[in-house]
């Protein structure tokens, strides 16, 4: 074997190793993207669970809070807005506009729920209703699960974005059309606190 053949073989080995490294980077970006999309799917499950609880809360309260029709309707409207934003975000997890719209809708829903629960405290019979107590306990549990799922999503997005922004991952991300994903950031300080459910 001549020196030229050995050199050519060495270059070939280096090229193959480099290509394998690039494939590994690409596959890592795909895995990280799938992780943050799965993390959003976990949020999605909890949000749907909460959206399903809200009409039951309102229906339970209707008989006691007949004079608070405006508040009850505001809660349902905020829920419907949040559901629409969640549907768009679940189709585009990590999309900046979708996540911003979801955040805004969730702020509106949290505000409506807090007003509703604040008014519900003025109705002693409602406060004592076992169904209402069970629904509120379930809502509190779901709010906690949403918070944990949101944190897991944001962590997964940070890992993905870091891989897309650091060298040499940024080169592979550019060729592979991997876009930076948006965190689910809460736009208002009040939204950082879970819905206050206390009876």
Question: What would you call each of these model-derived segments?
Answer:
Residues 2-199:
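A helix-centric hydrophobic-segment signal that preferentially recognizes long
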């Amino acid at each position: 074997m001549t020196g030229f053949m050995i050199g050519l073989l060495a270059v070939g080995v280096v090229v193959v190793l480099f290509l394998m490294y690039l494939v590994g980077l690409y596959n890592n970006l795909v895995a990280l993207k799938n992780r943050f999309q799965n993390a959003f799917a976990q949020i999605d499950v909890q949000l749907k669970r909460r959206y399903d609880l809200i009409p039951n809360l309102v229906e339970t309260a209707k008989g006691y809070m007949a004079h608070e029709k405006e508040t009850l309707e505001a809660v349902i409207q905020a829920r419907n807005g949040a559901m629409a934003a969640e549907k768009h975000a679940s189709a585009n997890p990590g999309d900046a506009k979708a996540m911003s719209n979801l955040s805004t809708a969730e702020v509106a829903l949290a505000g409506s729920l807090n007003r509703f629960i604040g008014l519900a405290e003025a109705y002693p019979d409602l406060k004592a209703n076992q169904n209402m107590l069970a629904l509120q306990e379930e809502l509190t549990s779901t709010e906690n699960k949403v918070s944990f799922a949101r944190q897991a999503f944001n962590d997964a997005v940070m890992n993905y974005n870091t891989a897309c922004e650091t060298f040499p991952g940024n080169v592979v991300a550019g060729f592979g059309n991997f876009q930076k994903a948006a965190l689910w950031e809460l736009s208002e300080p009040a939204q950082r606190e879970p819905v206050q459910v206390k009876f």
